């Protein structure tokens, strides 16, 4: 298990390096999806369906559940990055990251990769006050700061901290019982991380290519509309700009 953990940590480190990210900073998942040219579509899906991805040659696609919190969406994106860019024998399937119980080996590896990628160990430690780090008694305010800084869900963060032995089992249980959205509100944090969102959002250059084909008169107007409608966009809708 230690060997597997080390290999996953190296893969996450290399992924950051290959994408010009240092080894401690938080990741902007949407910017990275655009940079890596992964066509990404957000749709409301069932609660046990977090997302999935497809890969064929240089073409990459990701489907994400807009009903899940933004923090969980970010974890799902990182999980799918493992399937798209690290896993050799990848086969498309529905994913429910963070639910490793009963999951196959590749899902557990993808979860481990997501944790390493989004919450690098040294990045976490640098954000935790030394006194709290030494006592393994991390304050609620620091917990909230960490999950908002790294843009991850509360459950993903405390699981990572426990896995790194940065909090005790007792504190993990205490933090697990928090009503995190209410707690974040009481501490003055923005609540968008803990809420669903992005329904209908499309990330990627699909629309750019479709528009270019239409502008170059290589496809008809009706074909252009058909392509845009396939990703949930109606170009004829008035945006009401003044």
What do the predicted segments below correspond to?
Residues 1-242:
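Active-site hotspot residues in diverse enzymes, especially metal/ion-binding acidic/histidine motifs
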């Amino acid at each position: 298990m230690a060997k597997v953990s080390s290999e996953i940590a190296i893969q996450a480190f290399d992924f950051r390096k290959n994408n010009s990210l240092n080894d401690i900073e938080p990741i902007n998942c949407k910017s990275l999806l655009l940079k890596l040219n992964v066509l990404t579509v957000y749709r409301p899906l069932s609660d046990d369906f977090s997302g999935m991805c497809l890969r064929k040659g240089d073409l990459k696609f990701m489907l994400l559940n807009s009903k899940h919190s933004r923090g969980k969406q970010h974890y799902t994106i990182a999980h799918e990055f493992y399937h798209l860019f690290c896993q050799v024998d990848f086969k498309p399937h529905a994913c429910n990251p963070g639910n490793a119980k009963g999951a196959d080996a590749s899902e557990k590896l993808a979860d481990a990769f997501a944790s390493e990628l989004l919450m690098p160990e040294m990045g976490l430690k640098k954000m935790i006050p030394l006194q709290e780090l030494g006592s393994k008694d991390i304050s609620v305010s620091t917990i909230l700061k960490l999950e908002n800084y790294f843009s991850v869900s509360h459950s993903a963060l405390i699981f990572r901290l426990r896995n790194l032995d940065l909090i005790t089992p007792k504190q993990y249980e205490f933090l697990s019982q928090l009503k995190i959205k209410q707690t974040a509100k009481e501490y003055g944090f923005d609540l968008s991380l803990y809420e669903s969102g992005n329904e209908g959002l499309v990330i990627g250059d699909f629309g750019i290519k479709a528009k270019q084909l239409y502008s170059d008169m290589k496809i008809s107007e009706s074909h252009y509309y058909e392509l845009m409608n396939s990703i949930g966009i109606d170009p004829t809708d008035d945006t009401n700009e003044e």
